Amino acid sequence: MRLNSIKLSGFKSFAEPTNFMLPGQLVGVVGPNGCGKSNIMDAVRWVLGESKASELRGESMQDVIFNGTTHRKPASRSSVELVFDNSDHRAGGQWGQFGEIAVKRVLTREGNSSYFINNQAVRRRDVQDVFLGTGLGPRAYAIIGQGTISRIIESRPEELRLFLEEAAGVSKYKERRRETENRLSATTENLTRVEDILRELNNNLDRLEKQAEVAAQYNALQSQVTLKQQQLWFLKRAEAEAEQDRVRVEGLQAVNELEERMADIRNNESGLETLRQAHYDASDQVNQAQAKLYESTAEVGKLEAEIRYVLEGRQRVQQRLQQLSEQVLLWNSRREEAEAEIENLEGAGMDAEEQAEMLAAQVEEQSMRLPDLEDALRNAQKADTDQRASVVQVQQQIQVLAAEQRSLDEQRRQFETRFERLRADRNALETPDEARLNNLQSQLQEARELAEMADAVLNELQDSVPQLDEDRRTRQQAVNAEAARHADLSARLEALKALQEKVKTDGKLQPWLAKHGLDGMQGLWSRIAIEPGWENALEAALRERLGALEVGRLDMVRGFLGSGGHDAPPARLAFFSPPQGAPAPAAGRWQHLSDLLRVNDAGLRAVLGDWLQDCYTAPTLEEALSRRSELRPGETVYVPTGHAVSSHSVSFYAQDSEQSGLLARAQEIEHLEKEVRAQALISDESRTALVRAESAYAEASQRLVSARREASESQSRAHELQVETLRLSQLAEQARARNAQISADLAEVEAQLSDIEERRVAAEARFEELDMQLADSQERHAQLGDKVLESERRLNESREQLRTLERQAQEATFSRRSLEARRGELSRTIETASQQARSLADEQQRAQDELTRLTDAAAQGGLQDALDLKMQREQAVAARRSEYDDLTNKLRASDERRQQLEKALDPLRQRITEFQLKEQAARLGLEQYSTLLEEAGADLAAVSQSIAEANVRMHGLQGEIDRLHREIAALGAVNLAALDELKLARERKTFLDAQTEDLTQAMNTLEDAIRKIDAETRELLSGTFETVNGHFGRMFPELFGGGQAKLVITGDEILDSGVQVIAQPPGKKNQTIHLLSGGEKALTAIALVFAIFQLNPAPFCLLDEVDAPLDDANTERYAKLVASMSKSTQFLFISHNKIAMEMAQQLIGVTMQEQGVSRIVAVDMESALSMAELS
């Protein structure tokens, strides 16, 4: 194990990062005084765990941080790192498996000090454990600073023994013995406490057994009381439930009867409504039959007129045949008569029409009034029904109020009785003396507070340790996950690189390229990059040119084809020669595909600009298609997927060659390489966090063990005081509880009495209010009943007037239609007369034909049918009127029955109200006893079974309960917790007995371990002493050129005795080394240190100007000895002596050209010697 390098940053005068490389076995550090050479020694001591500022030549640990100069700011942190070659695996612990170990310490201005081994955060103790037994440490014999040589030789014997122990490697044994002694001390203390607790616990067991016997009697009696009370409540609950069921059944019967009667009323109302509808339908049928009768009457009149017309026509024809002149006169006379009659008919027709319109308006008006009257009737009926319900509601409220008043009177009597009994109990209550009890309770409170504080600390640690463990596990998982992700990214990267290499080396072109010596050239794709997402577009545009090769001149590619062009490449291949400059970018309507390229080579950009001159981009295929009309001939638009659109075509891209995907893979490889590097950093940070989490978890676990011990001790003390206090506190507590309970009961009873009185007064006032409200409601109900009868009368009169008006309107309409028919007949007569007058010349022949043609047979037959139909319709009208009258009588009778049924509902509703009140009272009783049973946590099935098995009756149960209460009172004060305390005490005694046995066994084991460690340490230290003493006796004359020296044990026991140095240079018989000169002391110390090295050579040794007190002759002997020992130990020494410099295999110069800042410089031997002479 050797030191490879020392890295300093911000440590003392080394403001900048400085790396001391130590390749040889003898490395000398030279430089003028005050340049910072000794800071190197301080740095090594500091990183190995030195925590005392004075040992580092400072007042505080902050002094090791560079504090700035006139031209430099102070550093924010100090860092020192030692890099060791551990190829021989000499380092101990888990780090021994590493071939190289880097130990690092970092200190910030905030005072945060951190240690790292191989970039993993560790504790200071972990750093020291690595070098246990190697002679390395903050104050080990392998680091000899200025003045340390003299301090070693002048150390007290006990201090000098430490160097011997370090050389013997017993540091780990001493650490084990110290830990074992700590455990033995803790075990002894625990055993003493357990024995004290056992003595106290045995004293308490007898008293607890007596108290537990009384508590068992109390529990048995209390169980009987609970059972009897639950049986009483159960029986009362069953009685209330039976009463509720009985009242509910009777109430349901009354409700069913009410519903039956209500169903009768609804059926009656339904029939009444049906009769009303039938009444309306019958009225409509009468009107329809009357209308049909009017139509038949008009038809008979029409047929009679036709018959008359035929007879008159025949007579007229005959008269015409006899005398034309008489016919003309006759027709003229008839025309005049018809015209006169038309004039008369016009006046009658206008009167008839006015009468019909007036009657129609009256019918419409009367019809519009009818709904208002029906609404008024319904509103009156609704108000009457609502008022009737209000009357019933008020009556029910009066009945409920009366029952409530009776209940309040009964409650008041009960509470007054209870009030008197409680006052008597309080007067008879005695209050015990509590002076001593208060003192004990104060002590108990203090003990409990201490126990709570210990529990709080324990709980906090119990909460934090799992969290820290979870954090440790989480960070371990994070380390695994980050490592897996790093491996995954690395695998993906290697796969892509392999695929890329395979594409480059495989294929048909590769042999041809190798043949012409072109296989080592890079394709175009490896020299360009494009914005992410546009790789396919660029491949689609360039195709085989993406793999183009660069040549100096394009003329030289003809030589690749061979003579006659028979050696052409087996696949498409492009060459390019970049020009000297790049063309200026051209502005356009579209974005050029070349604008997306990332190419630094101007010539290469010019080539690509030429190839992609007419290539543009569009974000989507839809946009490219929509704007293709803007393209000029030869221009093409590419979308990210590689599809191409020109002004008259669309080409879809697909990977169809061995060069496809080269550019995308190249960019992905570049991205993955960045991710792999970033992931490596993340993995390192995760491992560092894991080390910190494991350290925090281990520290918290140790604190948890101590906290558990302290919590156990506090709980034991509190338990002892609680047991002592319990006996005294029970009587006082029971007296206070009883007094408080009586006071609370009295206050409650007074409040209940006051509340009952207020409720009783309010009930009386409410009763009077409801009485007056009932009288008002009944009066209002009577008024509303009269209003309903008046509305029904007005509605019936309105309906009768409507039917009369409808009949008159139908008659007026029939009269108007008859006049219109007569007027039409007269108009035809006038027309006929006019025609006859105009055609007298040929009338004779036509008259003869008409005489033959005219006949009344058809009219006579139609007349008889019309008369029969008229008679039938007259009978139908009479039948409809008879039905209408019958329905009117039935409607009146049905309405009277409805009113009778409604009056019969009031007594039945009153009975239902009474049943509801009874059921409510039974339900309240049921709920009361159910609540009591539920609050008592009673098992209803078990209570019911106990009642059935013992044939329990309600009578006498209360007396039995009172008797049990008296027996309980006779027991006096009872410690109810005695049973649990006795059980806990016995369990605790069993546990403490086992713990005593375990602790005794542990003490024996620890004492045996200490004896074994002492024996091993004594044997190892004795052997080391003899060996070192021999080496010391041999090296002393070698350094002094004679004389003698030895080590002497100052006591009988080597484990605790000191070591004294006896040294006598040549010619001297001194009895103590304090009589030696400084140079002699230095040589003696060097001899002792080197003697220790002979036994257990440290990996390296640091010597800070130890040759300063020596003359040249002693220095030469010192240098020779160091040179011989460098075969097994690496030496780093600081010296101003040219003799010492000559033995160095490597020289490191330290200078301070900038005031206050140390730097290293290369030094040759001549410069070093001259520097030594100048110093």
From Swiss-Prot:
Q: Where is the composition biased (Polar residues)?
A: 829-838
Q: Report the GO terms under cellular component.
A: chromosome; cytoplasm
Q: Which Pfam families match?
A: SMC_hinge (PF06470), SMC_N (PF02463)
Subcellular location, principal = cytoplasm
Q: Which keywords, in A-to-Z order, does the entry hold?
A: ATP-binding, Coiled coil, Cytoplasm, DNA-binding, Nucleotide-binding
Q: Where is this region: Disordered?
A: 807-849
Q: Which HAMAP family match?
A: Smc_prok (MF_01894)
Subunit note: Homodimer.
Task: Name it.
Answer: Chromosome partition protein Smc
